[in-house]
């Protein structure tokens, strides 16, 4: 499993951003291999993290080539003060079974 953390500081969102964001979210969720997404906001609201989970890197590559994603990436300065992407291989995930999370790969 692959996780892609999109860590960012938001600026102002406009109608163009909201439309692109909705299209990108819909495309990502429809990809073969999409597992889920997890989102976090810092206590002060200045930092956010959207973590997307996929079965394989092929899905990540497909998302990265999506035309609307490329438009958003080219115009990111309009909507973000800064960002960092962290792509990781999830080698394990565990819990007590009472908290559902996209990274639960050990489901037995």
Predicted regions: what they are:
Residues 1-48, 58-65, 81-108:
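Short S/T/G/P-rich N-terminal loop/turn motif that feeds into the first structured element of a domain
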Residues 75-78:
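Arginine/glycine-rich "motif VI" loop of SF2 helicases in the C-terminal RecA-like domain
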């Amino acid at each position: 499993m692959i996780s892609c953390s999109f860590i960012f500081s938001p600026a102002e969102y406009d109608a163009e951003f909201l439309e692109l964001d909705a299209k990108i979210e819909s495309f990502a969720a429809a990809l073969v291999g999409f597992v889920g997404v997890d989102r976090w906001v810092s206590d002060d609201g200045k930092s956010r993290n959207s973590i997307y989970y996929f079965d394989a890197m092929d899905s990540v590559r497909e998302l990265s080539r999506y035309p609307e994603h490329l438009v958003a990436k080219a115009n990111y300065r309009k909507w973000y003060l800064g960002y960092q992407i962290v792509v990781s291989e999830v080698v394990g995930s565990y819990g007590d079974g009472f908290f559902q999370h996209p990274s639960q790969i050990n489901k037995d």
